[in-house]
Amino acid sequence: AVCVSLLGAANIPPQHLNLYQFKEMIRYTIPCEKTWGEYADYGCYCGAGGSGTPIDALDRCCYVHDNCYGDAAKIRGCDPKTQSYSYKLTQRTIICYGAAGTCARVVCDCDRTAALCFGNSEYIEGHKNIDTKRHCQ
């Protein structure tokens, strides 16, 4: 099946919340039958918090994203969860704009890398809503 996205070549202006932008990136890269919300409680790292060893490639995407946000937070005044940025969705890829090393660009690159990783990783239904106390130590 072919998934047609109206976002395909749209320039997305900065939004007030980074979560909206990250959600749009995810929606652009994942299979049509999935929703971005299905990635919000997956494995040990996709969603709030995170601990233990990632359980698969998709969970590793979230682990890397969490660490990337941790690095971004070291930039003076940078809050990755609320930092907006400029980007473009085009030809099945994502382009981040802005000066290298700035909070906005670093956060955009974190989200871009994670979204593309999601699109290239298998989604295993049994890894959604797992008991993290049991599986993520």
From Swiss-Prot:
Signal sequence annotation: 1-9
Location of the protein in the cell: Secreted
Alphabetized SMART domains for the sequence: PA2c (SM00085)
Documented EC number(s): 3.1.1.4
Disulfide bonding pattern of the chain: C44-C136, C46-C62, C61-C117, C68-C110, C78-C103, C96-C108
Keywords assigned: Calcium, Disulfide bond, Hydrolase, Lipid degradation, Lipid metabolism, Metal-binding, Neurotoxin, Presynaptic neurotoxin, Secreted, Signal, Toxin
GO cellular component: extracellular region
Cofactors that this protein relies on: Ca(2+)
Cofactor descriptive note: Binds 1 Ca(2+) ion.
Family: Belongs to the phospholipase A2 family. Group I subfamily. D49 sub-subfamily.
Name the UniProt record assigns to this protein: Acidic phospholipase A2 beta-bungarotoxin A6 chain
Organism field: Bungarus multicinctus
